[in-house]
Amino acid sequence: MSDRLLVLVRHGQSDWNLKNLFTGWKDPDLTEQGVAEAKAAGQKLKTQGFVFDVAFTSALTRAQHTLDLMLTELGQTGLPTTRNLALNERDYGELSGLNKDDARKKWGEEQVLIWRRSYDVPPPGGESLKDTLARTLPYYVQEILPCVLRGERTLVAAHGNSLRALIMVLEKLTPEQILKRELGTGAPVVYRLNADATVASVVDLAG
Protein backbone atom coordinates (compact mmCIF):
# COMPACT_ATOMS: atom_id res chain seq x y z
CA MET A 1 0.00 0.00 0.00
CA SER A 2 1.33 3.43 -0.92
CA ASP A 3 1.77 6.03 1.79
CA ARG A 4 -0.27 8.84 0.16
CA LEU A 5 1.37 11.39 2.44
CA LEU A 6 0.68 15.14 2.26
CA VAL A 7 2.34 17.57 4.69
CA LEU A 8 1.28 21.23 4.75
CA VAL A 9 3.46 23.89 6.41
CA ARG A 10 2.75 27.60 6.77
CA HIS A 11 5.87 29.71 6.26
CA GLY A 12 7.82 30.96 9.28
CA GLN A 13 7.28 34.45 10.68
CA SER A 14 8.02 37.16 8.10
CA ASP A 15 9.27 40.71 8.58
CA TRP A 16 5.77 42.02 7.90
CA ASN A 17 4.10 39.57 10.29
CA LEU A 18 6.35 41.06 12.95
CA LYS A 19 5.44 44.62 11.94
CA ASN A 20 1.69 43.81 11.92
CA LEU A 21 1.33 44.66 8.23
CA PHE A 22 -1.07 43.17 5.69
CA THR A 23 1.26 41.18 3.45
CA GLY A 24 -0.64 39.32 0.73
CA TRP A 25 1.39 39.16 -2.48
CA LYS A 26 4.08 41.51 -1.18
CA ASP A 27 7.38 39.72 -0.77
CA PRO A 28 9.15 40.20 2.59
CA ASP A 29 11.56 37.53 3.81
CA LEU A 30 11.62 35.64 7.10
CA THR A 31 12.65 37.16 10.42
CA GLU A 32 15.26 35.44 12.59
CA GLN A 33 12.36 33.83 14.43
CA GLY A 34 10.87 32.72 11.11
CA VAL A 35 14.16 31.10 10.11
CA ALA A 36 14.24 29.28 13.45
CA GLU A 37 10.60 28.15 12.99
CA ALA A 38 11.34 26.75 9.53
CA LYS A 39 14.43 24.90 10.75
CA ALA A 40 12.48 23.52 13.70
CA ALA A 41 9.76 22.25 11.35
CA GLY A 42 12.37 20.43 9.28
CA GLN A 43 13.98 18.97 12.39
CA LYS A 44 10.59 17.82 13.70
CA LEU A 45 9.77 16.06 10.44
CA LYS A 46 13.21 14.44 10.30
CA THR A 47 12.98 13.25 13.92
CA GLN A 48 9.68 11.56 13.11
CA GLY A 49 11.18 9.80 10.12
CA PHE A 50 9.57 11.71 7.27
CA VAL A 51 11.18 11.51 3.83
CA PHE A 52 9.69 13.28 0.80
CA ASP A 53 9.62 12.65 -2.94
CA VAL A 54 8.34 16.02 -4.17
CA ALA A 55 7.66 19.53 -2.88
CA PHE A 56 5.46 22.47 -3.84
CA THR A 57 5.63 26.09 -2.76
CA SER A 58 4.36 29.52 -3.78
CA ALA A 59 6.04 32.22 -5.87
CA LEU A 60 6.84 34.24 -2.72
CA THR A 61 10.18 34.38 -0.92
CA ARG A 62 8.95 33.65 2.60
CA ALA A 63 7.43 30.31 1.60
CA GLN A 64 10.36 29.33 -0.64
CA HIS A 65 12.87 30.20 2.10
CA THR A 66 10.86 28.16 4.61
CA LEU A 67 10.89 25.17 2.27
CA ASP A 68 14.64 25.49 1.60
CA LEU A 69 15.41 25.60 5.33
CA MET A 70 13.20 22.57 6.01
CA LEU A 71 14.81 20.58 3.20
CA THR A 72 18.28 21.41 4.53
CA GLU A 73 17.30 20.07 7.94
CA LEU A 74 15.79 16.98 6.30
CA GLY A 75 18.95 16.39 4.25
CA GLN A 76 16.89 16.62 1.05
CA THR A 77 18.13 19.81 -0.62
CA GLY A 78 17.88 18.28 -4.11
CA LEU A 79 14.19 17.44 -3.79
CA PRO A 80 12.18 18.16 -6.98
CA THR A 81 10.28 21.36 -6.22
CA THR A 82 7.56 23.24 -8.09
CA ARG A 83 6.91 26.95 -7.41
CA ASN A 84 3.58 28.40 -8.48
CA LEU A 85 1.63 31.58 -7.72
CA ALA A 86 -1.53 29.49 -7.32
CA LEU A 87 -0.22 28.78 -3.80
CA ASN A 88 0.41 32.46 -3.02
CA GLU A 89 -1.16 34.12 -0.01
CA ARG A 90 -4.54 35.79 -0.39
CA ASP A 91 -4.09 39.12 -2.18
CA TYR A 92 -5.08 41.90 0.22
CA GLY A 93 -5.29 44.53 -2.54
CA GLU A 94 -5.25 48.08 -1.19
CA LEU A 95 -4.60 46.77 2.33
CA SER A 96 -1.25 45.28 1.28
CA GLY A 97 1.65 46.95 3.07
CA LEU A 98 -0.61 48.81 5.51
CA ASN A 99 -0.29 48.48 9.26
CA LYS A 100 -3.45 46.77 10.50
CA ASP A 101 -4.10 49.57 13.01
CA ASP A 102 -3.76 52.19 10.26
CA ALA A 103 -6.19 50.25 8.08
CA ARG A 104 -8.73 50.29 10.92
CA LYS A 105 -8.35 54.06 11.21
CA LYS A 106 -8.86 54.52 7.47
CA TRP A 107 -11.82 52.18 6.89
CA GLY A 108 -13.14 51.50 10.40
CA GLU A 109 -12.59 48.49 12.61
CA GLU A 110 -15.83 46.77 11.61
CA GLN A 111 -15.13 47.00 7.87
CA VAL A 112 -11.56 45.74 8.22
CA LEU A 113 -12.81 42.84 10.34
CA ILE A 114 -15.33 41.96 7.62
CA TRP A 115 -12.56 41.92 5.00
CA ARG A 116 -10.31 39.80 7.19
CA ARG A 117 -12.85 37.31 8.53
CA SER A 118 -15.62 36.98 5.97
CA TYR A 119 -15.47 34.15 3.45
CA ASP A 120 -16.58 35.99 0.33
CA VAL A 121 -16.08 39.76 0.83
CA PRO A 122 -12.77 40.94 -0.67
CA PRO A 123 -10.90 44.10 0.33
CA PRO A 124 -10.63 46.79 -2.39
CA GLY A 125 -8.62 45.39 -5.30
CA GLY A 126 -7.97 42.13 -3.45
CA GLU A 127 -9.23 38.59 -2.90
CA SER A 128 -11.64 37.01 -0.47
CA LEU A 129 -10.89 33.56 0.93
CA LYS A 130 -13.42 32.25 -1.59
CA ASP A 131 -11.38 33.85 -4.39
CA THR A 132 -8.19 32.31 -2.98
CA LEU A 133 -9.86 28.89 -2.96
CA ALA A 134 -10.92 29.38 -6.59
CA ARG A 135 -7.28 29.57 -7.73
CA THR A 136 -5.71 27.23 -5.17
CA LEU A 137 -8.11 24.28 -5.43
CA PRO A 138 -7.69 23.64 -9.19
CA TYR A 139 -3.91 23.64 -8.74
CA TYR A 140 -4.23 21.16 -5.87
CA VAL A 141 -6.51 18.87 -7.89
CA GLN A 142 -4.46 19.04 -11.11
CA GLU A 143 -0.89 19.13 -9.79
CA ILE A 144 -0.52 18.21 -6.11
CA LEU A 145 -3.18 15.54 -5.54
CA PRO A 146 -2.04 13.28 -8.42
CA CYS A 147 1.43 13.12 -6.85
CA VAL A 148 -0.04 12.14 -3.48
CA LEU A 149 -2.30 9.48 -4.99
CA ARG A 150 0.67 7.99 -6.89
CA GLY A 151 2.33 7.46 -3.52
CA GLU A 152 4.78 10.34 -3.86
CA ARG A 153 5.33 11.73 -0.37
CA THR A 154 4.48 15.40 -0.82
CA LEU A 155 5.53 18.50 1.13
CA VAL A 156 3.79 21.87 0.61
CA ALA A 157 5.14 25.12 2.08
CA ALA A 158 2.73 28.00 1.55
CA HIS A 159 0.64 30.61 3.37
CA GLY A 160 -2.09 30.89 5.98
CA ASN A 161 -4.96 31.49 3.56
CA SER A 162 -3.83 29.37 0.61
CA LEU A 163 -3.39 26.48 3.06
CA ARG A 164 -6.78 27.23 4.65
CA ALA A 165 -8.28 26.79 1.19
CA LEU A 166 -6.71 23.33 0.90
CA ILE A 167 -7.65 22.36 4.46
CA MET A 168 -11.25 23.42 3.83
CA VAL A 169 -11.47 20.88 1.01
CA LEU A 170 -9.43 18.14 2.69
CA GLU A 171 -11.37 18.27 5.95
CA LYS A 172 -14.73 19.17 4.36
CA LEU A 173 -15.11 22.28 6.51
CA THR A 174 -17.78 24.95 6.13
CA PRO A 175 -16.81 28.59 5.46
CA GLU A 176 -17.61 29.37 9.09
CA GLN A 177 -15.36 26.56 10.32
CA ILE A 178 -12.38 27.38 8.12
CA LEU A 179 -12.43 31.05 9.13
CA LYS A 180 -11.86 29.95 12.73
CA ARG A 181 -9.02 27.59 11.82
CA GLU A 182 -5.68 29.01 12.93
CA LEU A 183 -2.42 27.84 11.38
CA GLY A 184 0.74 28.50 13.34
CA THR A 185 3.85 29.64 11.49
CA GLY A 186 6.22 26.75 10.82
CA ALA A 187 3.78 24.13 12.14
CA PRO A 188 3.45 20.99 9.95
CA VAL A 189 0.04 19.39 9.45
CA VAL A 190 0.34 15.76 8.33
CA TYR A 191 -2.36 14.14 6.18
CA ARG A 192 -2.60 10.59 4.97
CA LEU A 193 -5.14 10.11 2.21
CA ASN A 194 -7.29 7.22 1.07
CA ALA A 195 -7.25 6.07 -2.54
CA ASP A 196 -10.35 8.19 -3.22
CA ALA A 197 -8.52 11.35 -2.00
CA THR A 198 -10.46 11.56 1.27
CA VAL A 199 -8.52 12.01 4.50
CA ALA A 200 -7.59 8.82 6.36
CA SER A 201 -5.82 10.66 9.18
CA VAL A 202 -4.59 14.12 10.12
CA VAL A 203 -2.00 15.04 12.74
CA ASP A 204 -1.04 18.61 13.68
CA LEU A 205 2.63 18.75 14.70
CA ALA A 206 2.38 22.24 16.21
CA GLY A 207 4.13 22.71 19.54
From Swiss-Prot:
Residues holding substrate: 10-17, 23-24, 62, 89-92, 100, 116-117, 160-161
Active site per the UniProt annotation: 11 (tele-phosphohistidine intermediate), 89 (proton donor/acceptor)
Keyword Nucleus among record annotations: no
Listed Pfam families: His_Phos_1
Signal peptide interval: none
Reaction catalyzed: (2R)-2-phosphoglycerate = (2R)-3-phosphoglycerate
Keywords for the protein's UniProt record, in alphabetical order: Gluconeogenesis, Glycolysis, Isomerase
GO molecular function (one): phosphoglycerate mutase activity
Pathway in which this enzyme or protein is active: Carbohydrate degradation; glycolysis; pyruvate from D-glyceraldehyde 3-phosphate: step 3/5
Keyword Ribosomal protein: no
Site (Transition state stabilizer): 159
Entry similarity comment: Belongs to the phosphoglycerate mutase family. BPG-dependent PGAM subfamily.
Physiological role: Catalyzes the interconversion of 2-phosphoglycerate and 3-phosphoglycerate.
UniProt-recorded name of the protein: 2,3-bisphosphoglycerate-dependent phosphoglycerate mutase
Gene that encodes the chain: gpmA
